[in-house]
């Protein structure tokens, strides 16, 4: 049984359930939001992107990261297909690790206006040095449990 995609005031044209082209750069990517049916309840939502890629802005070589995005929703939830497309748009985007991580966190916060958001960018080593980048919007609401992001410190092959 096929359903017609629902449209909402939040995202009148959701990408979910539609054939869409992959955005070629982050600025062209659309992040969709949907109403939060539990907006009066504090809870944590987590997205994990273990195979995030972007390009070094100097060498053009690929960089790889494990991203963990935690947020306490306000009136909106982040729609996961649009997040996948947004993150994939960085594949041919040249930026330093810090810029990619913080820009992603800020863009999501702007779009969905969460009560709290944190992003951890765990970048795989280039030149022998892993870079971990963390950004958050402010104080976590007191009644929310936030588990550890679960990414072990890089230990090499040994």
From Swiss-Prot:
GO terms, molecular function: preQ1 synthase activity
Predominant subcellular localization, coarse grouping: cytoplasm
Keywords: Cytoplasm, NADP, Oxidoreductase, Queuosine biosynthesis
Alphabetical list of InterPro entries matching this protein: GTP-CH-I_C/QueF, NADPH_dep_7-cyano-7-deazaG_red, QueF, QueF_type1
Pfam families: QueF (PF14489)
Record carries keyword Oxidoreductase: yes
Residues at which substrate binds: 78-80, 97-98
Reaction(s) catalysed (UniProt annotation): 7-aminomethyl-7-carbaguanine + 2 NADP(+) = 7-cyano-7-deazaguanine + 2 NADPH + 3 H(+)
Cellular-component GO terms for this entry: cytoplasm
The protein's Enzyme Commission number: 1.7.1.13
Residues annotated as catalytic: 56 (thioimide intermediate), 63 (proton donor)
One GO term (biological process): queuosine biosynthetic process
SUPFAM superfamilies, alphabetized: Tetrahydrobiopterin biosynthesis enzymes-like
Compartments, as annotated in UniProt: Cytoplasm
Pathways per UniProt: tRNA modification; tRNA-queuosine biosynthesis
Role summary: Catalyzes the NADPH-dependent reduction of 7-cyano-7-deazaguanine (preQ0) to 7-aminomethyl-7-deazaguanine (preQ1).
PANTHER family to which the protein is assigned, alphabetical: NADPH-DEPENDENT 7-CYANO-7-DEAZAGUANINE REDUCTASE
NCBIfam families, alphabetized: QueF-II
UniProt record similarity statement: Belongs to the GTP cyclohydrolase I family. QueF type 1 subfamily.
Protein name (database record): NADPH-dependent 7-cyano-7-deazaguanine reductase
Species per Swiss-Prot/TrEMBL record: Rhodopseudomonas palustris (strain TIE-1)
